[in-house]
Amino acid sequence: MKSVMIAAATLAATSAASATLTQWSVVSTAVSNSGQNMIRYEVFATFNGATDTLLNVFNFGAVGSGQQDWYGGFWHKDNSDYNGGVLSQTYGTWAPQLTGSATANRPFDSFLLIGGNPAGTNSSNADPSWNSGGTGAHVGSSIGWSRADLVNNGTLGWFNSSPPNLQGRVGTAPNTATQVKVGQFMLSAGHETRTYTLTAGYNNGAGGSVQFFTGTFVLPAPGAIALLGLAGLTRRSRR
């Protein structure tokens, strides 16, 4: 089952430039691997300008009750030396450069990026927010994003370290004419609905000033996905 949901969002700032990030969008797909039933959630920044360019995202955080558990439980199947392509919730990395095979690993791996393909040439990097703050099992440390969980400090972010390569621009393959991928989250099929907030920095790709957008996106439980579909609140993905 695959569906697309439009996240509730609030525009944090605008300018005279034509670039507008209108919302976070989520594509959900049921998959199975290594005996595990999972839901793959792909999160995209959706724009309305022909050259809109995503630069970075930050202030990632869970919203609502039970959120302490929402920083963990992600599946990884990356090709890092501490994971080796084994599906795991204990070991993994969020670095897109280490995702591995486009068929054997990528469809079942959690990773973060600013557009482009999750491959060795991707120029997305973790910002310093991964190195400190947070509490309990999800505290930040010097390992950065080389971990299976997420830091719960409310400032978590990542960025394109080489903006001139236009990796974060709409229409630059594999980005579509309106969307730039910012992450893929793999969760067990029985998980509870999770809501996250995220802020983006972007411009119109043509010399415009940097603008900022803050909004929420939802990773719904499988039952919620089905109910939304019956209510006509989801649509089939064209991706």
Where do the PLM segments sit?
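Positively charged n-region of N-terminal signal peptides that target proteins for export
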Residues: 1-4, 235-239
